[in-house]
Structure formats: structure tokens, C-alpha cells
Amino acid sequence: MDTKTLIASEIAKVVPELEQDAIFNLLETPKNSDMGDLAFPAFSLAKVLRKAPQMIASELAEQIDESQFEKVVAVGPYINFFLDKVKISSQVLEQVITAGSDYAQQDEGQGRNVAIDMSSPNIAKPFSIGHLRSTVIGDSLANIFAKMGYQPVKINHLGDWGKQFGMLIVAYKKWGDEAAVQAHPIDELLKLYVRINAEAEIDPTVDEEAREWFRKLEDGDKEATELWQWFRDESLLEFNRLYDQLHVTFDSYNGEAFYNDKMDEVLALLEAKNLLVESKGAQVVTLEKYGIAPPPLIKKSDGATLHITRALAPALYRKRTYDFAKSVYVVGNEQAAHFKQLKAVLKEMGYDWSDDMTHVAFGLVTKGGAKLSTRKGNVILLEPTVAEAINRAASQIEAKNPNLADKEAVAHAVGVGAIKFYDLKTDRMNGYDFDLEAMVSFEGETGPYVQYAHARIQSILRKADFTPSATTTYSLADAESWEIIKLIQDFPRIIKRTSDNFEPSIMAKFAINLAQSFNKYYAHTRILDDNSERDNRLVLCYATATVLKEALRLLGVDAPNEM
């Protein structure tokens, strides 16, 4: 039991007027540590007990069992709890030594599946920084869900269908060079895509020609299908090379095209449930009772299916295939209205499991404050960006530690980790401005800063030639080690908060706080001095490194032992 839960349970024993969960949520951390480790404000009981908060605090402080704490005192309207540092540090250190990287493993999920729709780039378009957010947020959430006892199923719902293929076929037939595309597939396809979109803005017949080619593709035309398959194959080769660099894997690459033969069933289900309504020659589902208007188009007058219809088929397929406990869509916040419609239509169809679906939205990545756009050619391509990040990391490592073994692997871990961490430390609903120099810095709230703290601890443990013993009791009581102990003890709750809120930034900020707390401890404590506290301090180092490494792993970031 963590200390916050312990305090809430002890207060609940003497305050039957409040639920333990409510007490837990009211607990505060005093700004000054001299005022205790946690405090309960008595204001919330004033109305119920019809007494002044100061009097309530004083009376309750006397009733609470102090045996679990160093002391419990009333200060004005607050009950302040001072925790038993020796006892708690001993328990926490023992837990980490015993469990190792499994420390804070939880069983909420009980092995149930979580479907995660993530990354999902468009075929024949370059993998840009804009795709990075969905990829790394989804990958981190998969790690977090696994830590919570779920079985993540990572789905790359490729954008391998749609009118853009009509545009690309038109462009290739006008200006395409097979040899050039084979030599540099994505670069050439991007040039063609940008060029045809520019032409479409001044020539309206381009759009019609593209629609015609896409209709041919839908009808199985041989030439259209062969070009589509070629564009898809070349793009996947490129994407998989990048995923390898990012150390991201998937359980499914079923994209839009996979569901082409599943549209009729969706339409039949909607019709059987009498949900389709005629509107100006098209078919819609009315969702006014959900506050959604206008109604989503299901089928156009020409028989073409729309975005919402093409989202219903994957939702149904995933429920049948994975019987998910949760289904998560890591997609930009500009798609919020679409996901509200999707859930509402499924609800109308009688599928209450739609409540288990969550749109994990995120903000935009900008460059110099400007929105990125593939269509306009204003993109930051991921592959050269990763290469540049690795080069910058290598330069800093060379300056700090020229004799480091395996510099290339460490530079890769630091460079890639820097890009991932910078993205994940940002509250996902907020966007951020892309700044590679800030990302790869070893100073500030960055991935390399946290990785360096971990490497520093490993260096200390190597110098000391120290391995903790599971049969020895270790404990600490000084103020700076106590700050670290409290963070380590809080790790299980941080994991659950990250999972409950679908918010990896909670974990990233925890990692920063733990690294900062250790660096402060390192600056003021002679860890390797040969005295009675040496082993206790080294165990604290070991526990900190264990939790830092695991926090980084949950974010999809490697933790080198040397830097």
C-alpha cells in the first residue's frame, strides 16, 4: 500500500462522513517539507460537522492512529502527516531489489486485449515528423498497458486506399519515371504528389481524372491495381526501415484496403437495424439525440462509401477478432468530430462496447510556428531528422566521453530517444514546435538528460563494484534521499495515472523529476565514502537506476549504461 492510500484509509476510519477515495483526492503535499509529507485539509468537513476547520483538524489529529507514522499534528485547518522515513525507505528499497524491472507491475488488465490504432501513415507519402506523434504515443501506451496487465495489439491502419491514389496514378502517368521511382521511391512519389496537387488547383479536370482512376481501382482495373500495389510495396519498405530505427513493431498492418470487402456487411447491418435515412439521394444515420448534427453520410448517391462507413468496418472487425477491453485510436485532435460520430453510430447499432473506444487525440507539430503540410511540400521528413539527431548525439558523446565503447549504438539510443522523449513529455493535447537542438541537449527537461542520469548511476555502481542483497535490510532518513524514495514509491501510481489518462507525458515528467532529484542528491552526497551509510546510498542508486530505466522503457526510450 502506498503512503497516500495508507493515510486516506487511516483518516477514513475516523471520518465516516467521507469516502476513502474522496479523502485520497483531497490530500495535498505541503509546499514546505517541514510541515510534513502529506496534509489533509479539514475545510471539506466544516459544513457536515458544523465546526470550524481548525477545531476539526485538532480533534481528528488526536484520534488518528500514529503508530504508522513518525507523527501526526494539526496545524491550523490542516492535519499534517510526517511519514516514518526509515520504515518506508526500507520497504521501498526491498521491493525494488526483489522485483527488479518488474517493480510496479500491475494486474488490472488480467491479460485482456487493448487494440491500439496508431501511426497509420498514408502509402506513397513520406513518413514525416507529423506521423511521429501517433507512432510514439501509441507505442508508449502499448508498453504502459502491458505494465498494467493488458495485452496490447498494435495496429498500423495504413492509409492505402482513397482518392489520393487516383491523383498519384494521374501524376505518374503524366510525368513518372520508373527508374527514378525505383531508385528513390518516396522522394519521387512525393514530388509527383505535390506537383499534381499544384496542377489541380489551377485545372479542375485533374480532380475528375483522379476520381476516374480511383473508380477504376475500385473496380479492379489491372493497370490501376498494379500501380497501387507497387506504390504500397515501395512505401512499406521505407516505413519498415524507419520503424526499425525507432524500435517500433506492429501486430497488424491491416489498412483501409483490407476492409474493402467488408463494407457491404456494414451497410446491411445498418439497413437491418433501420438506421439508414434518405437525404438528398444519399444515406445518413440520424444522431440528433447525441447532439450530433448534421448526420454523418454513410453512402453517397453514386454508391461510394464514406469515411465514417470505412471506420465502422475496422471497429466491428477488431471487436470480433480481439474482443478488446479497450480500443484506442491515437489520431490528431482534428478528427474529434469523426470519432464522436463513429461511437454514436455504433451505439445506435446496439453495440455498448463502443463505450470502450477512446479517441486519444493530440496536437500538431509545427516548425517555426507554421503548420506542416505534405500537399504543399512543407514537411520535416523523419529519416534525415533521425540521422541528424544521431549525429548531434554522437558529437556530444565524443566531447564528453571520447573513449566510450560502442559509440555508434549509444549515439543511436540517445538521438532517437531524444526525439521520442521530447514528443512524449508534451501534454498530448498540446502541440509543440519542432526544435532538434533543444531535443538533443543534455541539459534541461530532455531525454538525454534523463539517460545521462541513468548512465551516471551505472558508473557509480561499477566503481563501487556493488550488487544489492535481497537478504539485507537497507534504509535512509536524510531529506534528499527521502525525496527520491517518495518518487520511487509513487511509480506504480504514476503508471496507473498514465494508463487511465492515456497520457505518456505523466511518465515523462516523472522520469525528469526522478533524474533531477538524483542529480541534486549526487551533488550534495558523497555516495562512495567508506562509512556506515555507503551501502544504503548505493542501494538507493540501484533502485533509482532500475526505476529510471523502466520509466524510459515505458516511453520506448533506451537507457545506455554508459554515455
From Swiss-Prot:
GO cellular component: cytoplasm
GO MF, one annotated term: ATP binding
Lineage: superkingdom: Bacteria
Motif ('HIGH' region): 121-131
Entry keywords, A to Z: Aminoacyl-tRNA synthetase, ATP-binding, Cytoplasm, Ligase, Nucleotide-binding, Protein biosynthesis
EC primary class: ligase
Keyword Translocase: no
Homology family: Belongs to the class-I aminoacyl-tRNA synthetase family.
Identification of the protein by name: Arginine--tRNA ligase
Organism: Streptococcus pyogenes serotype M49 (strain NZ131)
